[in-house]
């Protein structure tokens, strides 16, 4: 599928101070002459900062890595995880439409997005807050149907639950990620049938959901100040 850059482009791009520090740390993983290997994480951080990848962002990353612009464009246009057009200021919603989710009602979730956000995928809502698309398998088949909103998975969705999530996000809330039907992780809907006496170390949330709760806001743009910058391969101390 041919993918093109958006017709409207910003004049420039620059990483925030902390994101630049993070990017330089990633580049330092690779030996001299091999810095181009860092292109995917750097493009991803540029997208996390801005919400999408603009031409200035792609060219900025290419310059940092000593790459021809066309090489950066080849990578950015090849991988569908890179958004080449503006997305909603609050959240970009990705509905999984592959087999398990399709069977369990993904098409009804797409219908909600068309109604509440925009009739077409990748279009931004009238208030500028949301955009959406249907994507291939996101790997949470046991919790189908599901969607990725920002950095997190919202699972076991129904049209009503997705409507509620969009409304809460629109109001400034960040709903707790994970299953939306009350079950823990991907345990059977009817509850455990075996190993009931085994101490699993279960807490209020499973590990990935707990991480989202700890971060607090997993749909906001990444500025680089959210977590410590770690460069253990340099054998240095944790940078605040």
Residue ranges and their predicted role:
Residues 1-240:
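Signature of N-terminal electron-transfer/Fe-S-associated modules in redox systems
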């Amino acid at each position: 599928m041919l993918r093109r850059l958006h017709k409207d482009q910003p004049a420039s791009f620059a990483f925030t101070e902390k994101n630049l520090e993070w990017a330089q740390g990633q580049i330092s993983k690779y030996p001299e002459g091999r810095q181009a290997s860092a292109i995917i994480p750097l493009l991803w951080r540029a997208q996390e900062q801005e919400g999408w990848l603009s031409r200035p962002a792609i060219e900025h990353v290419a310059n940092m890595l000593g790459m021809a612009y066309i090489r950066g464009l080849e990578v950015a246009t090849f991988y569908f995880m890179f958004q080449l057009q503006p997305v909603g200021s609050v959240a970009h919603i990705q509905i999984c439409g592959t087999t398990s989710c399709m069977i369990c009602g993904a098409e009804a979730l797409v219908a909600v997005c068309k109604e509440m956000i925009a009739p077409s995928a990748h279009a931004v809502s009238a208030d500028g807050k949301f955009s959406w698309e249907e994507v291939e398998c996101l790997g949470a088949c046991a919790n189908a149907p599901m969607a990725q909103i920002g950095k997190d998975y919202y699972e076991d969705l129904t049209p009503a639950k997705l409507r509620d999530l969009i409304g809460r996000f629109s109001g400034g809330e960040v709903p707790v990620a994970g299953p939306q039907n009350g079950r823990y992780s991907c345990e059977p809907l009817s509850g455990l049938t075996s190993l009931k006496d085994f101490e699993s170390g279960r807490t209020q949330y499973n590990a990935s959901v707990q991480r989202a709760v700890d971060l607090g806001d997993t749909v906001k743009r990444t500025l680089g100040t959210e977590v410590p910058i770690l460069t253990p391969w340099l054998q240095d101390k944790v940078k605040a």
